[in-house]
Swiss-Prot record:
The lineage of its organism: Bacteria, Pseudomonadati, Bacteroidota, Bacteroidia, Bacteroidales. It catalyses: a 2-demethylmenaquinol + S-adenosyl-L-methionine = a menaquinol + S-adenosyl-L-homocysteine + H(+). Gene3D superfamilies: Vaccinia Virus protein VP39. The keyword Methyltransferase applies. It comes from Bacteroides thetaiotaomicron (strain ATCC 29148 / DSM 2079 / JCM 5827 / CCUG 10774 / NCTC 10582 / VPI-5482 / E50). Pathway: Quinol/quinone metabolism; menaquinone biosynthesis; menaquinol from 1,4-dihydroxy-2-naphthoate: step 2/2. It comes from the Bacteria. GO terms for molecular function: demethylmenaquinone methyltransferase activity; methyltransferase activity. Belongs to the class I-like SAM-binding methyltransferase superfamily. MenG/UbiE family. Keywords: Menaquinone biosynthesis, Methyltransferase, S-adenosyl-L-methionine, Transferase. This is Demethylmenaquinone methyltransferase. GO terms for biological process: menaquinone biosynthetic process; methylation.
Amino acid sequence: MDYPQQHIKPYNEDGKKTEQVERMFDNIAHAYDKLNHTLSLGIDRSWRRKAIAWLRPFRPQHIMDVATGTGDFAILACRELNPDELIGTDISEGMMNVGREKVKKEGLSDKISFAREDCTSLSFADNRFDAITVAFGIRNFEDLDKGLSEMCRVLKPGGHLVILELTTPDRFPMKQLFAIYSKVVIPLLGKLLSKDNSAYHYLPDTIKVFPQGEVMKGVISKTGFGEVHFRRLTFGICTLYTATK
């Protein structure tokens, strides 16, 4: 199926969205962590903890963190869940290089590894992982259905999927406040801290049109997952989706 965010590209150039997303994240990798925590006022850490708390009872030993970026979620998941193996995948080597340094400093290089992967064409075998996580990256998929289908393919039967994604609040006054914040504050801070003006216009543009709530639940369900649920966090600014294969 065709989704609006798939046509939004960071630099509005001809060519594949994936290539532009890769270039964008390579460009902002040096400032990404600072921006992420600043723009969310640090609340993103609590969102990650809620996602990991949902996984904890299942004790997954082999985890893939898709769109791992600089490895924030991977590091926290490794510390909290203590899996045998955690592979962070991303298309941006710039982001993963930052992640590799962080993992080394944390002393987790024996548990966490990184691999350059296109989420719509994963190189892993079927039924490979106990759990798959995606934190704030699924909006960037060039083909949402294909990406979800690939994650379902490499997840073991009975395995679990956890997605965190930024969403638009649907109630007054947060809806109006978030609209102003995303239209004015996010692009301004993004330009000041990352020096990439396009990246932080792209972010609110994709949040606005990305499937959310019941619609996203349906998208996940049709790609092979069951027991799909969602929970809105912090007045709907973020949504946690969970599913089982």
